[in-house]
């Protein structure tokens, strides 16, 4: 019997087999790669043992989905620039410069990849290529269609050779090295069997405990602020940089109401007699300010917190830069995650190396998540509100004349921040016995309140912390809210919001206790039916075309979440799958994690805080109302936090080189000064928690967040699916007819609140709409993207008339963060305004007018296009489900292959009965694959 023919993948730039390539074909492939290059690769050696090699591309730029082409370009950089320069042990990281919505963004793609073994012997090129392709494939999923403007390699080695003196390979040698790597990679990639690693014993707590820690209420803290002007650092610079010209601080005593007389201010121009250059004046001002704060702390003998409002995105970058350069004998410890600065700790270091914490810089915005002007209205309206000041027209020459006005503005900001934090701290301590100086974010505060006051970790309530494998699977079923445009234009509409959608969804039954894996949910042997499942299920889904507004989300290759009809595989919360069946979906469970279904442990938390919030609102206590609102809304998302995090350290150049070579989680390193580097390393959760013992665990329980968002989508669907629904955004709907009276209440938890009567509305894309509401004079405009200042009423009207229209605009990014140099800059950028129908397809009338949308339809695939894993799953389902075979009856290849598989199974069974092994050739090779 001849084995069935193996399918081969389509030969294109992303999927190509190399072992049979002639030199001519290979050179043609490389020629296509080189067409994208803009000039020769650049390189720089910032310090001994560190090399950066860059290859710029030109238009048309390659897409991030062109994995093979980009992997080849990375390999050329390694072969021609990195390998000739390294000595001893070496590692490297990969970077993209991506163009996302008109904004160039630098992304480090992975932690450091080893180039050599421990003894300095080079790892074979094909294995390096394999690592590169694995990394690029992961990013291709989310950035498939984004332009790659440049790639770069950062190499770290024990020693280095000047490239001017190194032995650079000739063109022919380079081609041979690259071709050899590609051919050998192709071989090992086809033959290698994936490793099924054993689960290691967990080394961290398996459930979220009650918080029983004793807490003292610190009575003193600081608030501070900086004002900046824009200045070019060098005459050759294109972009201007924010440079502090004024600063101030205030010590807040919880036993005394804030007083503007206690604010100390500093002004850069005051140092013009001792400094000639403005940058020196600014640095002198910051030195005086920080030194004064440190002296105030030392007089009291214990460390203190300094709050800046928006430290994470603005002030913190300048503070970190200043401390690094000016406090060389101190230890600086920032806590950063995804380029967000959560805190900066300043330690004094004694002669014997002991560290003593002096200051912790923290961000009040991360705790309260609202602009200062709005906080002033809620917490301290008696102070007169936030002032106004023309920041754009501040120049060095004007500083003497605007001194009084700028310091008045600065002092008002400091006074408001002090009053807000004083009041918020008092409320949280009085209500819950928690000192907010001990927490960094509002979500961390909400979790601490829940664990301290409302949670019982007994058998009926304990929330399990999934291990890495469990969390990774469940996270596939963690989707956000449902946001879609259904009809682009409507008149006389009703806009409704749900009162606290996610908190109300937290009242439903929750996945509690330890999970258990079931691998054969789709098998006839499995006695579990869908209605008995409670957990997160991988399933094969069929959504009929007649469903106009589908329920179940699906993640596309570019990361876009759509709600399609058709056939697809995904991981979903079991309750969504049950509801989908009631709508007409066909659901074929395959495998999943099953939990105990228990009454929600969040009921006391939600009901109590919501009741207190209504009471505060009725009494006009805006500050209390605000605290209750953000606390209640922030808890569910905290459980979904990714346990994978990064640690950023400021270390010596020598320590940076050691981390680059020997830390497996090394990501990147930036040189801050001649002897200091900013190093980022990725933490492995279990090892990280082991080091930190149990005092700082990552309480991540993604099953809670995924269940809450699943319940929320179920709650919204009956209203979304109405034929008169024009638009939805997570917890809101815009409809033509009023909702039933029993569904509407201005205060009831989980009910809809009528926000606006809409005279007319234009809905162009998710989070991009314009409403003319009867309750307000000006149109309500929402626009997601850099061009929001250009998105006026006229633009919406013109775009509705021609949804394919594009408009390139220039705009100013006022606060562009540059972590490589620790700067905040103002940059001129370009942005293409227009619509791109990614979530639903446009429907036009006979005159070409956009009048409606319809869901994307996916999954009417040719069997040859299915990836091997999906193919194998579907073949097994066909064996178990006759109705699914009927569904695929029009796919002759699929049914034929199923019949071959069934026939092979019969032969195998008969062979076993005869006691003879089945010959390998009797099983189709593509099924083995």
Swiss-Prot record:
Organism: Zea mays
InterPro entries: DNA-dir_DNA_pol_B, DNA-dir_DNA_pol_B_CS, DNA-dir_DNA_pol_B_mt/vir, DNA-dir_DNA_pol_B_mt_lin_plsmd, DNA/RNA_pol_sf, DNA_pol_palm_dom_sf, RNaseH-like_sf, RNaseH_sf
Gene3D superfamilies: Palm domain of DNA polymerase, Ribonuclease H-like superfamily/Ribonuclease H
Protein's recorded name: DNA polymerase
SUPFAM superfamilies (alphabetical): DNA/RNA polymerases, Ribonuclease H-like
Note: This DNA polymerase requires a protein as a primer.
Pfam families membership: DNA_pol_B_2
Compositionally biased residues, Basic residues: 907-917
UniProt subcellular location: Mitochondrion
Family listed: Belongs to the DNA polymerase type-B family.
Cleavable signal peptide: none
GO molecular function: DNA binding; DNA-directed DNA polymerase activity; nucleotide binding
Enzyme nomenclature, EC number: 2.7.7.7
Predominant localisation class: mitochondrion
Annotated region (Disordered), positions in chain: 907-929
UniProt KW Transferase keyword: yes
Protein's UniProt keywords contain Translocase: no
Domain of life from the UniProt record: Eukaryota
Keywords: DNA replication, DNA-binding, DNA-directed DNA polymerase, Mitochondrion, Nucleotidyltransferase, Plasmid, Transferase
GO biological process, one term: DNA replication
Catalytic function, reaction form: DNA(n) + a 2'-deoxyribonucleoside 5'-triphosphate = DNA(n+1) + diphosphate
